[in-house]
Amino acid sequence: MKKLFALLAAGLLAVMSGCGGQTASNESKSSAQEPVELHVSAAASLTDVMNEIGKDYEAEHPNVKVVFNYGSSGALQQAIENGGDADLFFSAAQKQMNALEKAGLLADGTRKDLLQNEVVLIVPKEGGKDISSFDQLTSDTLTHVALGEPKGVPVGQYSEEILTKLGILDAIKAKAVYGSDVRQVLAWVASGESDAGLVYATDAAISSDVRVVAKAPAGTHKDIIYPAAILKDSKHLDTAKDFLAFVSNDKNKERFAKYGFEVK
């Protein structure tokens, strides 16, 4: 009788253990599929390509929603410093990323140089003034020259470097109008509100309403590097790491190249 009781007890324990293991397994599986809202702050010049990448990532990870916040790198940096919700930051310049790193806001070992770009001079495709070089920006025939705001907009900082190196910055200051990000500069030229503007080559490439008349001469500005990093306070560190790796895969390297970026 004692032997029979022991056998029955052992069997019951095995069944209970099996159920417990199954429950734990189900809980683990359920946890892995919990909804995740990944917040990505990215430079405005990355809007089109990152929207494509985000859709692909969501298709492969149905439990993840990628929420993008686009703007000037300077404005995004300030928002992050002020506690804004961001898991990753894609900047159009090292300056803003350096500031966040110095403040201790980046997750250790996650910063990487992702892309490279260049600055070009654009004019409206139709009905624009007849200019073909940076030097002609000083002409009295031009009323407005669109630039990025130099304090917080990387393309504005690069533009000032270029115009200073060419010795024409002071000559065009009276006609300069400053956009809050590179897409505003592009829009002003595309609409004809500005006679010319300085934007990234990748932004000029997506508009059928502007034409490129000159590239910034070599040596007139710092290399235009786009760094990326995960924020230390990310609520979804594992997903953020996975997304950053996804952005850098071979398929997306080709996608960046399609938009005119040089992949690092």
Map each language-model feature to its residues.
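Periplasmic-binding protein-like
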Residues: 87-91
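Exported/periplasmic ABC-transporter solute-binding proteins
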Residues: 19-55, 74, 78-82, 93-94, ...
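Conserved strand-loop elements at the edges of beta-sheets that form or border functional pockets
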Residues: 70
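Conserved beta-strand core positions
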Residues: 38, 64-66, 119
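N-terminal hydrophobic signal/anchor transmembrane helix of membrane proteins
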Residues: 8, 97-105, 111-115
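Signal peptide-proximal N-terminal region
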Residues: 55-67
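A short linear hydrophobic-aromatic micro-motif
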Residues: 65-66, 109-110, 213
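Sec-dependent N-terminal signal peptides of Gram-positive bacterial secreted proteins and lipoproteins
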Residues: 1-24
